[in-house]
Amino acid sequence: MISISPKALAPGSDKAIEKKLDLTNLTPEQVALDINKLNLFYGKKQALNNITMSIPKGQVTAFIGPSGCGKSTLLRSINRMNDLVDNCHISGEINLHGSNIYDKHVDVAELRRKVGMVFQRPNPFPKTIYENVVYGLRIMGENNRRRLDEAAEQSLRSAALWNEVKDRLHESALGLSGGQQQRLVIARAIAIQPEVLLLDEPTSALDPISTLTIEELINDLKKQFTVVIVTHNMQQAARVSDQTAFMYMGDLIEYSDTNTLFTTPLKKKTEDYITGRYG
């Protein structure tokens, strides 16, 4: 495990001079997601223990922690992907702009339109680049070619991919490099204009250059969406996030602005993890 140098977040850096939010006292207008006393079980095994936190709008929030700590489970709870797991049950609430996503009347398909997700490995469909991007729009019933064309271009531009593929939109997406495929998947996710974008270790299968491109993209995406990212890479969390949550064995140990968590953590477990004493 590599420790984080405080110099990376020293005063004068972009991350250090950004205005900090009081995460314990956000106004309703500042909150995208409000998680309240969330518990999740796989059968009798408890994977999340009474998680309570608020995730701000228009910022990047990172979940970090050792393997098996619950960070990906928490991420998947935000768009109810855990519903697909046998014998999984949940108590507590996750409120998206004030509405509990676990209310029995919630349309889960509509929820997943509002809360998009990108996984560890790029998963383009065996279709053209264009059809990958507009896939969700077609599912929603959009068939107007002009609107589809506009959405495809806008989404590919937002994903920093347009200039690389604009002359081969009707070629197979499977011919793209790994980094390009991951940006294509991000373009597909944002084409339907979600409110929140979930990224589950989006660069773990990519080379360093592609990783840097995705990290720069994340910084741009928060201008349009609320972004929540799971990462094993603490340097990445320090680079891309505005606030960071450290999890351990299903518990939320510490949650604060990223600069504070990596330079002056309040909890001994957090300090031990970020300095490489375990994990």
From Swiss-Prot:
Organism whose genome encodes this protein: Colwellia psychrerythraea (strain 34H / ATCC BAA-681) (Vibrio psychroerythus)
Similarity comment: family membership: Belongs to the ABC transporter superfamily. Phosphate importer (TC 3.A.1.7) family.
BP GO annotations: phosphate ion transmembrane transport
EC number(s) reported in the record: 7.3.2.1
Coiled-coil stretches: none
Keywords from the UniProt entry: ATP-binding, Cell inner membrane, Cell membrane, Membrane, Nucleotide-binding, Phosphate transport, Translocase, Transport
Its biological purpose: Part of the ABC transporter complex PstSACB involved in phosphate import. Responsible for energy coupling to the transport system.
Quaternary structure and partners: The complex is composed of two ATP-binding proteins (PstB), two transmembrane proteins (PstC and PstA) and a solute-binding protein (PstS).
Entry annotated with the keyword Cell inner membrane: yes
Pfam family for this entry, one: ABC_tran
Protein name, per record: Phosphate import ATP-binding protein PstB
InterPro entries, per the entry: AAA+_ATPase, ABC_transporter-like_ATP-bd, ABC_transporter-like_CS, P-loop_NTPase, PstB-like
Membrane topology label: Peripheral membrane protein
GO molecular function, one term: ATPase-coupled phosphate ion transmembrane transporter activity
Record localization: Cell inner membrane
Gene Ontology cellular component list: plasma membrane
Residue ranges of domain ABC transporter in the record: 33-274
PROSITE patterns with a match to the protein in the record: ABC_TRANSPORTER_1, ABC_TRANSPORTER_2, PSTB
